[in-house]
């Protein structure tokens, strides 16, 4: 049988709506095209294809293949990049999701967070898979992630010897070959395999205990007693979350206190999209690269679907503004062998050519980055959620209280009550700490004033986003944006003349002596002020809302001893059931927010998230407290950690 026929029979045999197929090896573009076409035709099912691909010269070329990018998004280019980790692509009008896991097979499989028991319906191995990695320890990882009746198949181009060896290894972990017209049967020795799988899943969950992964009791059908999922917010993060939930068939209601979407931190005329990189490419840096790629995909996909979005992926030129920052920029670009599509070193001459203006410093160029209108991005994401699953929006509705009762969340405004909702997500930016349940979250508000200056003379030639001490965008509707101020716990969001001048000074300081800087005119007092919530480690907050009262109660009995460290390592940290947090996006929420939203939607619905277990820990809202508890350090609520 061909691979397509085998997988078609596996898919057809499943009674559940969600079907997951795993594959080791990328295969040829022709075969991958056949597979994607096959999966896309199953309109009655929600299909996920998980491709585990070793990073090599060959796979890098295939990932960049123009035919593949066109296949993934016929109306717009989707860029895959050979970096380790998961890159999620949503195709076929959200009925097919493809996760590209790049790197060593075993490493990628072991990094997957456990959301529920086995979820993979069938595994396939292509002839181009690295057979040196196909060892017994790998097959046990496949089994750990599989349903009990999951099937196993190989390309028919394998030699008879290789087929015999691989099928034997698969059978030893309870994965059986799919035979023509014969449904899989549980073998007599499988109970031992199933027990081993359960033990491996328990081990994985134990590793996740400090940063729990919690699904909600949601269904795809709202009822009188269950109105689905509520989101409090109104910016890019909440709109992208609504879209990710809608793609899973969820009924979503978004509560926004303003007269329209994107009136707070997401209300700027232009916002830059580019990754946050570190010299050592730490976990934060790795997350931002994957998030950046997903954000670009979301943006391009929404635009291709006809949503009006002002954006220009014209690239971002990042230079230093003094000796210290120049050394930092050099340390970043020289610290790793970055993929050229992510970041590459440029000279002063190259920077000037790219930007269209004279620049005296070299630095970093992010070729796929650029700017987007956050308001347009927000509206497009929500309108798409409304189109595919009827997401609803309640404007001018300020929620003043949230209350958990009888297995659901009830919301109260000044005039109405809403609910009950099986899940509630707080994605309300600067107000994320307004409720008792989240008042101690470690995120701080920073006021940011963005100045608007008319495009004129030499300044009008700017053709890429500039980033140094401050940032400046190419013109859109005859205006450039530059900024932004950074004022902690500011008392208001009124226009500030001093901050307007400070924004100009930042550009002057960054590009000393350049004639084009003289064309920047801030005298029109045109600006916009917002508040972005910033975490100390610069990572977003995504996950179940921590129950700090319960944590502190347990802390009284488990603190400052070796035994207490073991306790926090092995017990699930307390959370508020059905309550989730999406916030702390800081100044790069356009880059980090959409993937955080997609991951949270997956967690809520009990799906596998497109991020690693390390990323789950990085983003978890309880991480500041848990880092201290896991080290046996003292904990004090209300103090920044």
Swiss-Prot record:
InterPro entries listed in its UniProt record: FAD-dep_OxRdtase, FAD/NAD-bd_sf, tRNA_MAMT_biosynth_bifunc_MnmC, tRNA_S-uridine_synth_MnmC_C
Cofactor(s) listed in the protein's UniProt record: FAD
Pfam families referenced in this protein's UniProt entry, alphabetically: DAO
Catalytic activity: 5-aminomethyl-2-thiouridine(34) in tRNA + S-adenosyl-L-methionine = 5-methylaminomethyl-2-thiouridine(34) in tRNA + S-adenosyl-L-homocysteine + H(+)
Gene Ontology biological process: methylation; tRNA wobble uridine modification
Gene Ontology CC: cytoplasm
Keyword RNA-binding attributed: no
Top-level taxon: Bacteria
Spans annotated as tRNA (mnm(5)s(2)U34)-methyltransferase: 1-219
Major localization listed first in the record, in broad terms: cytoplasm
Localisation: Cytoplasm
Region annotated FAD-dependent cmnm(5)s(2)U34 oxidoreductase, chain positions: 232-641
EC number from the UniProt entry: 2.1.1.61, 1.5.-.-
Molecular function GO labels: flavin adenine dinucleotide binding; oxidoreductase activity, acting on the CH-NH group of donors; tRNA (5-methylaminomethyl-2-thiouridylate)(34)-methyltransferase activity
Alphabetically ordered keywords of this record: Cytoplasm, FAD, Flavoprotein, Methyltransferase, Multifunctional enzyme, Oxidoreductase, S-adenosyl-L-methionine, Transferase, tRNA processing
HAMAP family: MnmC
PANTHER family: SARCOSINE DEHYDROGENASE-RELATED (PTHR13847), TRNA 5-METHYLAMINOMETHYL-2-THIOURIDINE BIOSYNTHESIS BIFUNCTIONAL PROTEIN MNMC (PTHR13847:SF283)
Family label: In the N-terminal section; belongs to the methyltransferase superfamily. tRNA (mnm(5)s(2)U34)-methyltransferase family. In the C-terminal section; belongs to the DAO family.
Function, in words: Catalyzes the last two steps in the biosynthesis of 5-methylaminomethyl-2-thiouridine (mnm(5)s(2)U) at the wobble position (U34) in tRNA. Catalyzes the FAD-dependent demodification of cmnm(5)s(2)U34 to nm(5)s(2)U34, followed by the transfer of a methyl group from S-adenosyl-L-methionine to nm(5)s(2)U34, to form mnm(5)s(2)U34.
UniProt xrefs under NCBIfam families: MnmC_Cterm (TIGR03197)
UniProt protein name: tRNA 5-methylaminomethyl-2-thiouridine biosynthesis bifunctional protein MnmC
Organism: Shewanella pealeana (strain ATCC 700345 / ANG-SQ1)
Gene giving rise to this polypeptide: mnmC
